[in-house]
């Protein structure tokens, strides 16, 4: 079987490098005869690993999340904070879906990464119709939409002038020369009944409505605290391609204004806002990035083209080394594992980004990697490939880890070693004071940010800190982690294996992960 190397390399390293694996570690049992210092380190390692393991185990047990199929999107949905889109663009969203399938969506745009200075607002009206369950993204629902009207309102004179020039350069004569746009006045960018349309000036599209997922969960096991989240399709990282892109992943979720996390201050502010009163979020200071300690996924994450995973990163700031555990699954709630990847390398401290306000730039190098197939289909697929380009030929077994460093990675998974990526990070605190770590969003075209000019300008879903420091750089007990990870995965049923094989082949044919 031949799988295009270029396609593989586009998506596997993205999922790899800082995309995601991760179940927490097993507890270590120190030898009672060990040196006191070793006992102290072992005890600390056991504690931090128990914390990280507990947080990821919660995800792998379904995190008590209910997915609505088909989704009920009727209601008012709002952003939970200041979102960053590629460009960068800083935005908050407020979407209303009505029982007659119509919708009204506000997109509030800002001049900074804290969403404190609104510059313009789009008001989008249209109609949406849910279709079938997505055959590409499991757990998602496909939808069609039709736009009826789009209005734009500038919130200061300089922006009104700039937008007027942009629109007229794109659509000559769209705005009469004697009637330039003014501040706080609504103007049509699209009106269905008279054919008025110039959305391409802003590279605007609402294709996010083509992929939908609704999740429900009760926070802290409290039946009185229901939270509903609406996931809409991802936005292409190249603004010029947004009008032609069909989503294959998700944006950060919106929360139902009626059933939202009560600690979400931004939710309440955005809920009360409109085009004449855009939301102004509370100002926050940018946190200094400190890459140390351990960080894990907060949810089962979705990557383009049938890739579901969780991540666990370990940073050793004493010597600038890092480790990443990436656990991949065939399902959107991360219950059925397919393979794991353990990677490690070095990172260099960068500088504050001149392009993305609030971001800090890093360079990551990967020089060591291990792979573990977690189901029969994946092991079989790895054994199909000829030559020693992914571990020892024909030697792959379910649950048995192999070091692929000596074969310069794994061509079957699209991984080449050594590999360098140019990253961007930011750090925030949630309403409960917990630290969140964001790293760069993978390019939508599947390429790798292997040059400075390809560095991301937006972010992935955040990781949450599960251990604040790491005593010293050492390889964590991967065998124990894999045993825990695989203990709940009955991957030998023929039907499950067949499905996993199809999913794996479809995914691998589009990956290009550490290229």
From Swiss-Prot:
The keyword Membrane applies. One of its GO terms (molecular function) is Wnt-protein binding. One of its GO terms (cellular component) is plasma membrane. Residues 27-490 are extracellular. It is a single-pass type I membrane protein. Residues 509-515 are cytoplasmic. Keywords: Cell membrane, Glycoprotein, Membrane, Signal, Transmembrane, Wnt signaling pathway. It comes from the Eukaryota. Coiled coil: none annotated. Residues 1-26 form the signal peptide. Glycans are attached at residues 100, 168, 319. InterPro entries: APCDD1, APCDD1_dom. The keyword Membrane applies. The chain crosses the membrane at residues 491-508. It is found in: Cell membrane. GO terms for biological process: negative regulation of Wnt signaling pathway; Wnt signaling pathway. Belongs to the APCDD1 family. PANTHER family: ADENOMATOSIS POLYPOSIS COLI DOWN-REGULATED 1, PROTEIN APCDD1. Negative regulator of the Wnt signaling pathway. Inhibits Wnt signaling in a cell-autonomous manner and functions upstream of beta-catenin. This is Protein APCDD1. It comes from Gallus gallus (Chicken). The gene is APCDD1.
């Amino acid at each position: 079987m031949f799988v295009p190397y270029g396609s593989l390399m586009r998506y596997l390293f993205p999922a790899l490098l800082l995309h995601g694996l991760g179940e927490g570690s097993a507890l270590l049992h120190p030898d009672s005869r060990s040196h006191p210092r070793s006992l102290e380190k072992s005890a600390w390692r056991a504690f931090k690993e128990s914390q990280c393991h507990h947080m990821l185990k919660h995800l792998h047990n379904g995190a008590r999340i209910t997915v609505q199929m088909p989704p009920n999107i009727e209601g008012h949905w709002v952003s939970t904070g200041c979102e960053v889109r590629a460009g960068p663009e800083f935005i908050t969203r407020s979407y209303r879906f009505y029982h007659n399938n119509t919708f009204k969506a506000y997109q509030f745009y800002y001049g900074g990464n804290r969403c404190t200075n609104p510059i313009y607002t789009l008001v989008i009206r249209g109609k949406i119709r849910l279709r079938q369950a997505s055959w590409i993204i499991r757990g998602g629902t496909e939808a069609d939409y039709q736009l009826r009207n789009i209005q734009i309102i500038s919130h200061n004179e300089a922006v009104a002038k700039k937008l007027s020039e942009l629109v007229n350069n794109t659509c000559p004569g769209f705005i009469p020369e004697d009637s330039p746009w003014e501040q706080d006045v609504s103007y049509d960018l699209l009106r269905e009944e008279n054919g008025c349309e110039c959305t391409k000036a802003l590279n605007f599209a609402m294709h996010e409505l083509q992929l939908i997922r609704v999740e429900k969960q009760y926070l802290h096991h409290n039946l009185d605290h229901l939270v509903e989240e609406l996931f809409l399709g991802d936005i292409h990282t190249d603004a010029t391609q947004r009008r032609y892109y069909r989503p294959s992943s998700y944006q950060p979720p919106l929360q139902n204004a009626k059933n939202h996390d009560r600690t979400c201050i931004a939710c309440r502010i955005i809920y009360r806002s409109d085009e004449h009163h855009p939301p102004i979020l509370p100002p926050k200071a940018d946190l200094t990035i400190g890459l140390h300690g351990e960080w894990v996924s907060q949810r089962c994450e979705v990557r383009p083209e049938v890739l579901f995973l969780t991540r666990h990163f370990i940073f050793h700031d004493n010597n600038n080394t890092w480790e990443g555990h990436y656990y991949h699954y065939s399902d959107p709630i991360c219950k059925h594992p397919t393979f794991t990847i353990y990677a490690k390398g070095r990172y260099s401290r960068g500088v504050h980004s001149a392009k993305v306000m609030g971001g800090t730039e890093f360079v990551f190098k990967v020089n060591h990697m291990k792979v573990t197939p977690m189901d029969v289909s994946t092991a079989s697929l790895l054994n199909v490939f000829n030559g020693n380009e992914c571990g020892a030929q024909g030697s792959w077994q379910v649950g048995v880890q192999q070091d692929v460093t000596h074969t310069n990675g794994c061509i079957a998974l699209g991984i080449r070693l050594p590999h360098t990526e140019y990253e961007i990070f930011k750090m925030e605190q949630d309403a409960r004071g917990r630290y969140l770590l964001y790293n760069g969003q993978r390019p939508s075209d599947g390429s790798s940010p292997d040059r400075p000019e390809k560095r991301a300008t937006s972010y992935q879903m955040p990781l949450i800190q599960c251990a604040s420091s790491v005593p010293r750089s050492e390889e964590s007990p991967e065998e124990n982690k894999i045993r825990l990870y695989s203990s709940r995965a009955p991957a030998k049923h023929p039907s499950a294996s067949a499905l996993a094989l199809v999913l794996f082949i479809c995914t691998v044919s589009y990956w290009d992960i550490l290229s």
